[in-house]
Amino acid sequence: MPSVTDIFDRIYAGFIGKAIGVRLGAPVEPTIWSYERVRDTYGEVTQYLRDFKNFAADDDTNGPVYFIRALRDYGLDATAEDVGRTWLNYAAEEHGMYWWGGFGVSTEHTAYRNLRAGIPAPLSGAIATNGTTVAEQIGGQIFIDSWGWVNPGNPKKAAEMSARAASVAHDGEGLNGARFCAAAIAAAFDLTTIEEVIEAGLATIDPNSLYAGVARAVLAFHEQHPDDWRACRDMLNAEWGYDRYPGVCHIIPNAGVTVMALIYGQGELTRTVEIATMASWDTDCNAGNAGAIVGTMQGLQPGWDKYRKPINDFLVTSGVLGTVNITDIPSFARELTVLALRLRGEEPPALWLEDFERRGLRFDFDAPGSTHGFRTEPFNQIALKGSTAKHTETSRGSLEILLDRLERGQGGRIFWKPFYRRADFDDERYRPMFTPAVDDGQVVRFKLWLDPWNGDGNLRVAPYVKRAISDRIQETGAWHVPSSTGWQDYEFTVPDGDGEGVEEVGILVEYFGRLKFLGRLYLADFSVAGPGKVVIDPKREVQEWGGITRFTWNRGHWTLQNGRIHAHTAGDADAWTGNAYLRDVTVTAEVTPLAGKSHLVSARVQGTSRFYAAGFEGDEAVIVKEDHGTTILARAPFKPEMGRDYKLALTVTGDKLSLAIDGKDVLTATDATYRYGAAGLRMASAGRMSVGKLEVVDR
């Protein structure tokens, strides 16, 4: 049975493998990139086909990050219906998360519409509901990696759980794909050859299925032609090609490519994802699935570096939780390890349980070679890598910062980005949305250790934050020369930003000596913790990603007009901000009802369908709970005037909720359903409202 450390390391390696495969395959995913066109244009793929400022969101990685949250929200025995609720809860309607290709065309779009219409899973994805073509597209296997990772060494259970999860949108051969890929990942924790891993996956599906048939055809061809994957690809095209299977992206031809990449890649990650990419068809899906399996089996390897370094432990997702969308891969691997241990009936480490719902950040650099997404500016004289040369008592590693021949007055920034804007990306794939993961008032702590090689030692550092809209840099402490004899502790409080979000948090470095400085600076135990304050002044925000900076949104039209937020909707609509794990807070907003009956603020928001809200509903003031349906927790007569400004304040402390209007307490209620969540604005029905300043203050 794998140890806790081995589980964590292999999940981390597997997710890196998934991310590498998706990033490598994505540029040639569109169907216009035929097999012949990829071959003639790129020949042998041995590196990324495109450089990215930051790789934007992708449905292949959205699903593994978000759908596993069913185990958080509904427990370890979550049903297919629970996973269906999870789909609804974390996806904004028709932007982000899925390929919104149309009802009856996109399997995920179809399932989402069914769920919205009240058809529960697994009926939402059943052949009886949607027909065989829609039910057997490739999505059955591309979202399920996490179900394998939380079942290390238990392929049978991984297959069962993944099939339940996949049944939200898929059926038939689609479920076979889910079983195979998740079981192969689970088996990869224990097995040492790719042949064994493939057989473990196939053992969980019907041997007479088409999925097993195409896999066996590939394995048989490999026995006869072990050195010619292109001949195998020709066989797949002739006998199992797209012309034989209807729909936009059927699972069977792509299953053949996935197994082909696995067996011809011979258990080596880079070759596996390269074959999956060169083979065309659904390149990011196939390379992503194969990369997840092989990455888990192989574990981290130095030979991955050309693909691993650009990822930098950073992944963008595009659900409705803006801080979750800034995914730190080692931290997510730790979350999955907690779930894996719970499913095995074991108690996770106490600190990891805190991480599971942490209102803040903790980067320990414990995963081999991990960087936690830290960055440098400028790039040419400062370089980063995960290192084991120095570490603290609680970690196997630290961040090694190479400072290469700095002259007097030269330096730069070493930082983590808690917020992203449109300019940080080359495209708008899957429309990610972000809210800052670091807030004013929170405390930042870290350790530094200087290892000077050359120079007169006068290298100084100072902590800082950078603001998101103005690019203003705020130094938050005096300049110091770091210790060269051991770890030195640093601590600062994020200063008031005058209503502007935090885009960078880190350290400034500058050399004040006469001789050129060459050496290393090590950073360890970086954390952001404690209560904070979110202040959003609409005058300081801009419109991006179809919404407003520092907000995620679902339905309605959210714009900036005359220095205020303007919301307009024909049904329900929400906009959210703040950390996904806020607990006891007061959410205050300057709200002006303009039309309609519903004008609310929200707290402990865990998605589109799980939150508390309070404010005006018709001729009443209300406190409500939303849990895929509305429960009124408290109500009182109150008829708001259209066009008049009101200050709404919703306070949640423990299981106590209260609403104040213009500073006067109006309602109280008690409910213990939600312990944490983001905050925001809501209209539960058609109408318009204008909103001025919004504040979210930890209590």
What kind of region is each of these model predictions?
Residues F365, Y420-L459, Y490-V494, F526, ...:
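Extra-cytoplasmic beta-strand recognition segments
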